[in-house]
Amino acid sequence: CARRIWRSMAADAYTAKDLRVAPISRADADRVVRLLHYSGKVVPNSQLHLGVFLGDRLEGAMQFGPSMDKRKTLGLVRGTPWNGFLELNRMAFSDRLPRNSESRAMAVAFRMIRRAYPHIEWVVSFSDAAQCGDGAIYRAAGFLLTGIKPNNQILQLPNGSLVARVTVTK
């Protein structure tokens, strides 16, 4: 049958349309983020955890939740109620996923959010250009670039690990 042949194909034969996005547990999402995200850190107040599957394998995760600094972010879109937006806190994908997986997975996730949480009007995310580019995958998914500024909030410790400035005490 065609399905059996499709499943036996090499991973590079997959396209972004072959991805499946589905809810996963916080524990599974945290594990993927710790393993694959450049910071190795999760956002503790994330509330919605979506897995990105290629075949039966979990190859990525997206974690959504309230914005880390809601007062500053709320003003980006005039008239937004306090609970009217989410932040894509973390997105971590394995290199085994095909081209355009990020924008495809975000599009599917946004449709899921729109259906399940109709009060959510928009999603915000931040891209660290020093670590992972200039936000091109976000713009490909329909995000608007609202600003670029130097990142002075991530510090590299002498042992090479990355930490948020707010977690370091003097």
Predicted regions and their residues:
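A generic structural signal for short, solvent-exposed coil/turn residues
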Residues: A13, V42-P44, D56, T80, ...
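A generic secondary-structure signal marking the coil-to-beta-strand transition
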Residues: K17-R20, A29, L48, L58-G60, ...
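Conserved beta-hairpin
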Residues: V33, S46-P66
